[in-house]
Amino acid sequence: MSLQELCRKNLPDCELPEFFDDYVLQLLGLHWQDHGSLQRTGKNQVLVQQEPIHINEALKSAASEGNYEIVELLLSWEADPRYAVVGALESNYYDLVHKYYDQVKDCHDMLPLIQNPEMFEKCHELNNTCSLKCLFKHAVIHDMLPILQKYSDYLDGWQYCNQILFELACKRQKYNMVVWIEGVLGVGNFKILFTIAINNRDLQLYSLGYLIILERLYSCGQDPTFLLNHFLRDVSMKGLLPFVLKTIEFGGSKEIAITLAKKYQHKHILKYFETEEC
């Protein structure tokens, strides 16, 4: 092991000697150009010119500068290689991207680290076997609405894909996506929202479904009673009191709920209504 390797391995966990100027640190590979001294202080943290920073953020920054030496050093200190690829991608250092992408293997593993829609799409393109439908699904999962908005003309009329995205948004509790997909793209089977909400015990989604569909029915002059009581029967038979109450709040029949509670012996529902009447 060389002196440089020995120092890089052992010095980072100790306080750097005061006589270590930039020249010495450069010789030891512990100087980050335009930043200063670099020192490891724990598994997930480094000091950059004595300022603490998460090792992965340091790696992302070094990669965005195309600084191979610092990237290699931080990776040897067990930084997450995903941040190297994301940082390099931000500044179009594709030679560095391809060098470390093999350590990541799946672009989808990096998507949660990205907040910028353009970068998100750029990262997804690293896997050239993925389709646009795959991009759209991950846009839903990671709340990247601007991507769906960008491709809204492309998605317009693609009912099969829009239905998949809508159901995915419901299952993943991406409520803003649910509203946008239904309102802008449209879906063939909106009622699946209620099935998903009931199966997942997602009262917020269940309520959102009524807000959307009742507005549509009222605007067309249609009576929502049949729809309300249809789902009221379902949640009443299952004994889901919060869903029963929410349906009644929107106009469902309390009598139906009580009748089914008696039939299926849901004592907690009966007790609620008995207490309410007292």
Swiss-Prot record:
Induction: Expressed in the early phase of the viral replicative cycle.
Keyword ATP-binding: no
Keywords of the record: Early protein
Cited InterPro entries: MGF_505 (IPR004858)
Domain of life: Viruses
Pfam families from the UniProt entry: DUF249
Similarity-based family: Belongs to the asfivirus MGF 505 family.
Reported function: Plays a role in virus cell tropism, and may be required for efficient virus replication in macrophages.
Protein name, UniProt field: Protein MGF 505-3R
